[in-house]
Amino acid sequence: DNPSALNLNDDVFFDKKNNVVVSSDTYVEGVHFLNFRKPDLVIKKIVRSSISDLYCKGVKPKFIFIGASGNKKSFSKKNLNLVYKSLNQEQKKYKIKLSGGDTTKSNKTTVTLTSLGYSQKIVQRNKCKNNDDIYVTGNLGDSYLGLLILKKKLFLKKTPQRKYFIQKYYMPDLPTKISTKLIKFANSSIDISDGLFGDLTKLINRSNLYF
């Protein structure tokens, strides 16, 4: 039993004694991203998807650690330079620091990113109350529409709208401003990854409520 693990039912690990908040996510080529043909965009998607776990808890991420595996093609000099450039951009944008990691060989590209921040409090999943209002940030479904376009399951001509949805797939907006206020007014929170209904159900079940 480790109380900091929050019963493995939350987005993060929270060491209340030391004010440490940690989240870890793994992304597999063909499962969590289509391919590694645009490594500069894929790494941005991975960074933002990972640090959003901390933002949704009301915590500002400070450090990230990246473990990656791939083949010679995915780890080519050209791709590594693109990844390096994107990581620098993301570090400046979100004021985070790449602080370690590891690389190894594999057939498919796989990336594990661990995010770390500090906070005396977090917004947990299991604190919902009856009659709580429900809020979301951003436009739900933009990233999914971008995925459908890339998979050629949704056809849009080369318009600003098409470019917009693809951009949201690779570079989702993070609620950095509202995140700092969550601890003051939110009883519960979750980083949406399985759709609004699916993740709302998780919040309700974790809080032993029903609908």
Where are the regions that the model predicts?
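Helix-biased detector of long, well-ordered alpha-helical tracts
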Residues: 1-211
